[in-house]
Amino acid sequence: MTRNIVLAFTISWLGIIFSFAQNTPQIKGVITDVDTGEPIPFVNVYYEGKAVGSTSNMEGEYSVDNKAAIGWGKLTFSSVGYATQVVQINSSTRTLNIKMRPDLILSEVIVKPKREKYSRKNNPAVELMKKVVNAKKASDLSEKDFYNYDKYRKLTLSLDNVQTNDSLMSSMFKKYPFLLEQVEVSDVTGKKILPVSIEETASEILYRKDPKEQKTIIKGINSGGVNELFNTGDMLNTMLADVFQDINIYQDKFRFLQNPFDSPVSQSGIAFYKYYIMDTVYVDTDKCFHLTFVPNNPQDFGFTGHLYVLSDSTYRVKKCVLNLPKKSDINFINSLSIVQEFGELPTGDWVLQNDDMVCEIAYMKSLSAVQVRRITKYRNFGFDPLPAKLFARKGKEIKDVNAMMRDDSFWEEYRPEKLTKAESGMNHFVDNLRQIKGFKYIIFAGKALIENFVETGTKDKPSKIDIGPINTIVSRNYIDGLRLRASAQTTANLHPNLFLKGYYAYGFKDKKSKYNAEVEYSFKKKEYLPREYPIHSIAASYMYDNMSPSDKFLSTDKDNVFTSFKVVNVDQFNYERTAKLKYQWEQENGLKTTVVLSHSNYEATGRLFYRTMSAQSAFEQNFSTLSPQQWERSPYDTKDYTTTEITLGVRYAPGETFINTKQRRVPISLDAPIFTLQHTIGLKALGADYAYHLTEAGIYKRVWMGTWGHIDTHLRGGIQWSKVPYPLLIMPAANLSYILQDGSFNLINNMEFLNDRYASLDMAWNLQGKILNRIPLLRKLKWREHLGIKMLWGTLSDKNNPFLPENKNDAMLMMFPGHYLENGTYQYSSYLMDKNRPYIEVSAGIHNIFKILHVEYVRRLNYNHLPTANKWGIRFMIRTVF
């Protein structure tokens, strides 16, 4: 969730600050068959030689920006089976309806009229594409024993479609002339843009076939713009790089916009796309077949576009143009164009040389759009054997220690073309932005909202201490009542290896102070935060606070004001006092090792109490002598218990990538599998009361179902091997708030089931609107379906079962949690599970409501006879996805 909220907020924030009053005028119309009057879908509407245009929808409707004012006076309409039309336009043209005449013969290739049903059988376009797919292995560089090449990438973020002649903007440019100086004309769209951020990366790609390995050596990084206003500004560039990943059309599938796409040059693509031969044309000096392609369903995740294939026996792709269909179900994207150009090396090898992407993004149509431009150049290819030492360094991506400090001479060598005036003056532009009256308050608010922290520094004196998280300042719970908290953490500006953080909280109901202090030493220097990848650190902490047993399952801070509102009354707490020493070592291959030594004391509070079975026997014998207040706080109770633990954990997530926020590190590549294994040893040392062994393991995997979305699966299991009282048994991960949280049960109460062996399955299916997109009244809403099922198997062995007669007077086992009713009856709130009857809850929901809201109806299917059971509920969360 967080990773896309960052990008969505940035887009909205830029749109609000620089939102301009008027948009470029549009030309709209309907394209029909001159003979039948029927609408013609998938007609290409474009300005010749320009990457600006659109495609008609199923009703033959189209819209395109009017570019006559900048000299683009001719609009071209082309479609297989129809004669191409070129129409003269002027700046006043608003409506343009087109009648197209069938033309069955197109440049040596006979095709069937468009109005006939598309067939892949005996289709010359499909037969040609099969030859292209069969020949692509000959152009696959991964078949080489070795290769290396230089890669240059420039990623520019700009405000799109700037109206310099608008009255509102004229006054703004007059007041702030540096804004006008920053405006330039896009060489692709012809629109006026205002660049606000740029990042250049120069790298070398190394590859060997046996053993197969590829490494990226980042030699230089040059970054500037509004992202520099944020100390975690790398979030924006990291997100953009993940969303707009490089595309290899020779792969069967590739990841783009955080979704898998079928390549038009693949076996699966032949089934996914419709292909049409348009003409034979020359690209540079090479004669090529010109093909167009469209998805079978324009709302599925696929491209429309053009392929230019050499008209010789090699069937190599000379040029590829990818566009996103107007009716695509992808959020935020107004338009997208990718142009890839291939060429032959002196060695005869065929390689990608230029990759140019332009994307226009807007969170809302009422806000100005943002243009993302990515230019990638590939050069200096080599195929000689590479020394083994080049592959000895760990990690797929290795950053040169001087990458961020390259001078102008370096960039003159690696930069294939000069920066524009606006791009080269980005730092000066940001300095001018800082001088705008009130701008610092906008940045302050933006930082607080995005980062959830308030900085204490300035531009000249970067923040050494950040105050936050902000959303934990005020919260409430059963013990504290109203709770106020002050938190802070140091940054690498104070020390690049040593970090401090902590909080002080006060509860107005129990009138007690709570606190936490932590010191962490990182063995690697950090740019800002200790959590930056990869982690290699040791930390010591001391905490005293009240905790509900279910708090440990929260993915957010327990004092998060939004999750402090519970669906049930949570009144069973501990006062927890914990001293902890934690060592973490994370390797570039995705393997993370954690060792934790902790010493904790738990004192029951609220309506939680600890009473051994032997003490319960004495309690029952003397029940009549006790007052109701003593039923849950009797002289027979165990006031507290103490543990000393050593925990060893291993986590393996190959290919996982992250963005760093000031509160936590957020994974942005959810396709990576995750394997976890953890063993905890309880030692009867340092005053601890129990000795035990606990083992838990887990697996996560996302499986894509083609056009039917994806299924996320979590499988977990664990065993408490020893005889222990109930606080040390295994309780389900219960989510007691209204906010959805991954990996937890929505309708299980606090400690509702206690087991010493368990297995759980959590499956969530995001259908990506596959069904709702086919319902006419709902299609335009772009709602997406979500189905889920959560299951829990659990059992309690005899040695840990306090309900068995042989354990009635046991001095270690404790009676399960519950509450005394007014008549003195004890009602349990924790229960045993039937090992042959798993707990099941299902959910059905809709997300992408207003592009941001996810709502689910959850239903509990069994164990509803329990007095504390909640049969159903409504849960929600903020979630933005493409």
Residue map of PLM features:
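Bacterial Sec-dependent N-terminal signal peptides
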Residues: 1-30, 45, 104-113, 530, ...
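Structural motif
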Residues: 30-40
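Short, acidic, small-residue-rich periplasmic hinge/interaction motif at the N-terminus
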Residues: 32, 44-46, 78-80, 94-141
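Hydrophobic beta-strand segments
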Residues: 43-47, 75, 111, 149, ...
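A short, solvent-exposed loop/turn motif at the edges and junctions
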Residues: 47-49, 74-87
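Short, acidic Ser/Thr/Gly-rich low-complexity loop/linker segments typical of extracellular
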Residues: 51-61
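Structured extracytoplasmic
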Residues: 115-288, 294-302, 364-468, 472-475, ...
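Exposed, low-structure sequence patches enriched in small/polar residues
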Residues: 259-260, 393-882
